[in-house]
Swiss-Prot record:
Similarity section: Belongs to the polyribonucleotide nucleotidyltransferase family.
Protein name (record): Polyribonucleotide nucleotidyltransferase
Record's keyword terms, sorted: Cytoplasm, Magnesium, Metal-binding, Nucleotidyltransferase, RNA-binding, Transferase
InterPro entries: ExoRNase_PH_dom1, ExoRNase_PH_dom2, ExoRNase_PH_dom2_sf, KH_dom, KH_dom_type_1, KH_dom_type_1_sf, NA-bd_OB-fold, PNPase
Complexes and interactors: Component of the RNA degradosome, which is a multiprotein complex involved in RNA processing and mRNA degradation.
Catalyses which reaction(s): RNA(n+1) + phosphate = RNA(n) + a ribonucleoside 5'-diphosphate
Lineage top rank: taxon: Bacteria
Organism whose genome encodes this protein: Thioalkalivibrio sulfidiphilus (strain HL-EbGR7)
Length: 693
């Protein structure tokens, strides 16, 4: 049982791959250590294939164990539960660059599991997990056309930083993860503070250049410890079947792909597919199966759509490569919400709603590195009706979580700080129609809904999805892709940003050989499209509303001395509870004495403020107060002049005339005006009624 180790320097960290000792029954297993963040990644491929399967069943599961950070999970069961948002997003991040590297026709089940076992809070486990997945697959003998490398790139003080620490990322203008093979970039996921297209492309190329060190070491590890390659052979292409399908329907299918309206087009394509299957898959000996006929029909669809674009002919819906679909924008579409927008681009439509909340509405996130509170949430819903289908409705799927995070990345750079916007914000994007690029419609709708809610965004933002069709050296970059173009194309390239720069870039490439020239063209064309969309949005709403909705909470903020916090809270929280119940407000007090009062009704907020000021006010010597007599004694009367502050009016200070008995002049409950004569060192207050007059 000999462990084989390989190490290399990767930015400021040393990365070590170890195999041969742990998880030896997996097809491939690697323990990756990057500066004490340790991830065990396994890959298992099954040799048997289910009969009739026509897809590649790859699953990737990334899971974080709380013991990795020396913590015990919360909750009743004290064990990890369903995947967190971070785990779901990282699973997608690993899946996206490895999926296109399995050969066409490979239908064997493959599962990759990455388990975080030790966590250095300065090193995010996502890059080690991606490197581990690449190494495990390279060792497994599976027909994987890798390995891939992965790198995180930051941008600090005008310079790129390889694999920055979590502390450095807080000050970085860029957080970009790039993955690719030795020759080509396959995947980019990034968030930026409105950087130029040149800086973004430079970061992608820098990351690809630096990841070669990881690819080299993975190749060395596979050469030394890899399992024998599977004797899998790609199924032979059935040229006769392809020709038969083309002869049966090519002209009709070409005509169908000129129907601009999605549902009418789909009906025609489905009818043609059924007719061809019925004609060719007869069930007779030697006749092809229905699955094989459908596969050949799908290949014909792809060829027709792609060749039209490469020849410069109109796209499916009649557009050229640069034109964006017609856009309509409406704001304030839902009367009782705090901010709303309806964004429609062709057959893609989103109703986006913004809600303004208080500090107590912030999301408590129990991450592996500890708890934190999230003040801005963006949720994306993709119901089945948006594509004219039926289906399950319930908790969000991986895709919905991924699209929601991408839309959030798109607007994060223009979000105001807490000082400019004291609200906790939740945005929900309801996709009501979908024909490509619904995540970018969510970016546009979010920008509009937040401005409609009166949130002071630094600038409006918009997003656009680009596509690519490439055959040999010929290629065409297409703007604002349809769902069919996404499915049949070679690249999905989403860019969000303001007029001044890029806020998010997501790229998934299905083929080798995407050059810098192609990416430059795609970014330039995306900018052109983004500026066009912003122009349409700005024509309806170009800056935030000056007033928040009448139904949104209004904030009143005041500062009290930290020593006075206990006076506002009261014994067991009784005072603050009474305050919130009696005024109908929500009150949050920070340790530094900042008090935030939230109320939908302005008068209620003013009343709560007045009462807090009374509770925390200092008694001023020489000032006249109106107070209530609370206790009569032989020697005088106690009067409450401020909440919780009583003073004594001595019998000699009640009147200029001689007073025989206090009760002759005062009774409990009387309202009287008194002047403060003295506050002694023990805080006792001496009052006078006769000094008032």
């Amino acid at each position: 049982m000999t462990a084989i180790k390989k190490s290399f320097q990767y930015g400021q960290h040393t990365v070590t791959f170890e195999t041969g000792e742990i998880a030896r029954q997996a097809s491939g297993a690697v323990l990756v250590n990057m500066a004490d963040t340790v991830v065990l990644v396994t890959a298992v491929g099954l040799k048997d294939v289910a009969q009739g399967r026509d897809f590649f069943p790859l699953t990737v599961n990334y899971q974080e164990r709380t013991y990795a950070a020396g913590r015990i999970p919360g909750g009743f069961f004290k064990r990890e539960g369903r995947p967190t948002e971070k785990e779901t997003l990282t699973s997608r991040l690993i899946d996206r660059p490895i999926r296109p590297l399995f050969p066409k026709g490979f239908m064997n089940e493959v599962q990759v599991i990455a388990t975080v076992m030790s966590m250095n809070p300065e090193v995010d486990p996502d890059v080690p997990a991606m490197l581990g997945a690449s190494a495990a697959l390279a060792l497994s003998g599976l027909p994987f056309k890798g390995p891939i490398g992965a790198a995180r790139v930051g941008y600090l003080n005008g310079a790129y930083v390889l694999n920055p620490s979590m502390s450095e990322l807080k000050h970085s203008d860029l957080d970009l993860v790039v993955a690719g093979t030795e020759k080509a970039v396959l995947m980019v996921e990034s968030e930026a503070k409105l950087l130029s297209e040149e800086v973004m492309l430079g970061a992608v190329m820098y990351g690809h250049e630096q990841m070669q060190a990881a690819i080299k070491v993975i190749n060395e590890l596979a050469a030394e410890a890899g399992k024998p390659a599977w004797d899998w052979v790609a199924p032979e292409e059935n040229v006769a079947l392809k020709e038969a399908v083309a002869a049966a329907c090519e002209a009709e299918l070409t005509a169908a792909y000129q129907i601009a309206e999605k549902q009418a087009r789909n009906q025609q394509v489905n009818a043609l597919r059924d007719a061809v299957v019925a004609k060719l898959a007869t069930g007779e000996e030697g006749a092809p199966s229905a699955e094989k006929v459908k596969g050949a029909f799908g290949a014909l669809e792809k060829r027709i759509v792609r060749s039209r674009v490469l020849k410069g002919e109109p796209r499916i819906d009649g557009r050229d490569t640069r034109t964006v679909r017609p856009i309509t924008v409406k704001t304030g579409v839902l009367p009782r919400t705090h901010g709303s927008a309806l964004f429609t681009r062709g057959e893609t439509q989103a109703i986006v709603v913004a809600t303004l909340g208080t500090d107590r509405d912030a999301q408590l996130i129990e991450a592996i590195e500890g708890e934190r509170r999230e003040r801005f949430m963006l949720h994306y819903n993709f119901p089945p009706f948006c594509t004219g289908e039926t289906g399950m409705v319930g908790s969000p799927k991986r895709r919905e979580i991924g699209h929601g995070r991408l839309a959030k990345r798109g607007v994060q750079a223009v979000m105001p700080g807490e000082a400019e916007c004291p609200y906790v914000l939740r945005v929900v994007s309801e996709i009501t129609e979908s024909n490509g690029s619904s995540s970018m419609a969510s970016v546009c709708g979010t920008s509009l809904a937040l401005m409609d809610a009166g949130v002071p965004l630094k600038a409006p933002v918009a997003g656009i999805a680009m596509g690519l069709i490439k055959e040999g050296d010929a290629f065409a970059v297409i703007s604002d892709i349809l769902g069919d173009e996404d499915h049949l194309g070679d690249m999905d390239f989403k860019v969000a940003g303001s007029k001044d720069g890029v806020s998010a870039l997501q790229m998934d490439i299905k083929i080798d050989g995407i050059t810098r020239e192609i990416m430059e063209k795609a970014l330039a064309q995306a900018k052109e499209g983004r500026l066009h969309i912003l122009e349409k949005m700005n024509a309806v709403l170009s800056e935030p509303r000056t007033e928040v909705s009448a139904y949104a909470p209004r904030f009143t903020t005041l500062k009290i001395h930290p020593d006075k916090i206990r006076d506002v809270i009261g014994k067991g929280g009784a005072t603050i509870r009474a305050l919130t119940e009696e005024t109908g407000t929500s009150i949050d007090i920070s340790d530094d004495g900042t008090v935030k009062i939230a109320s939908v009704d302005k008068a209620a907020g003013d009343e709560a403020r007045r009462r807090i000021e009374e509770l925390t006010a200092d008694v001023e010597v020489g000032r006249i107060y109106e107070g209530r007599v609370v206790k009569i004694m032989d020697f005088g009367a106690f009067v409450t002049i401020l909440p919780g502050r009583d003073g004594l009016v001595h019998i000699s200070q009640i009147s200029e005339e001689r007073v025989e008995s206090v009760s002759d002049r005062l009774t409990e409950g009387d309202l009287v005006k008194v002047k403060v004569l003295e506050v002694d060192k023990q805080g006792r207050i001496r009052l006078s009624m006769k000094e008032v007059g």
